[in-house]
Amino acid sequence: MKIMKDFNITTPKFAVAATAKEAEEEAKAFQAHEVANAGGEPVDFVVKAQVLAGGRGLGFFRENGYQGGVQVCESPREVGIVADKMLGKTLVTKQTGKEGKKCNKVLVTERFFIRKEKYVAILMDRSAGGPILIGSARGGTSIEDIAHKYPESIHKMPIDINKGLSEERLREFAGLLGFSGDRLDAACQCIRGLYELFVNKDCTQIEVNPLVETHDGRVLVCDAKLNFDDNAAFRQKDVFAQRDYSQEDPREVAADAADLNYIGLDGSIGCMVNGAGLAMATMDIIHLHGGSPANFLDVGGGADQHQIIEALKIIQQDKRANCVLVNIFGGIMRCDVIAKGLVAAAKEVGFDKPVVLRLEGTNKEAAKEVLKAIRTDPAYASLQLLQEDDFDKAARLAVKVASVVDAAAKADLKVHISAP
């Protein structure tokens, strides 16, 4: 919310607290300010768990069963009590999955009464070749549901990034959302600020839901999601300095540190592939044969042995993955580098998950010699390796192996899989 204020976007009064005492003190400061400026009127507060996930209001905290990551409080003391129930606990919502997200901070904000809720987003649109404004006079709930039930209420306005957002088009868009009079001017100020933020901070998405009209005539951004282009990290140091790694998938954090293209998924078959296209095709063929990938991992063409080891470490630590499909088409990426990385990982980190290995291309035969040389070496006894040259057969084999390992785990049995 602070970054929005820097662009003259109106938001509720707020403070972020890391302890229950700090939250209570911030609420007291709010109350003192409001009483002094509102003729003695008391104020209510809203406490929101700060986790990177939606659905907080309907979530629950795993450790104490406390219901709701968004709570209305009537006094600073209640703010402190509620914050204590949230901080340090794991909030589970529909978007977090059963693992949940740890709440390290809470947002304390004023409570206000909403007259109308709107939806506004700015995205990069491929078909428009630039930014596009998307809005609806119906906000406050899932935009997907709104688009399904009331498609006519969704308004889109492409923006020429070279010309920017003109005042005329800005007022036209705000009018489509149902703003008029003084509120139209206030809405234009917010939307203009959102666009300037989008451009100047290298955003790929800004979603505001809701943008509200309050009973006292204000227009406020109440909740927002912002995505920033990772490629702009070098010039948006202030933004990326706020990155909270505790809210991210630890697998993706480790991959980022090793300069690997990795996206964690929920399946049981770990994937290590070179090239994004082949990686997606590998995931597709796993699905085709009834399996489910545990990740997207593109080691690219320039990965070295160290990166291969780091990639396998990530898969080794992933409890979801019970086998690995390594699918390499050697061009710039040499097959022997993959083989040496696999061998080193077996020795250094005791990599012991079954590996279905498919290698084609540059130095394929050299890779086979590397693997043949360690076949009877007890130092590599943990390595469960199955080699298959055919892409389709390799995928089928990986799905079968994952199924066997899963069944064995459910029966509390240990299995060791190796080639005949």
Predicted regions span which residues?
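ATP-dependent carboxylate/acyl-activation modules
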Residues: 1-208, 212-326, 336-348, 360-362, ...
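A generic structural motif
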Residues: 329-330
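Short glycine-rich, flexible loops that bind phosphorylated cofactors or substrates
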Residues: 333
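Short internal beta-strands
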Residues: 352-360
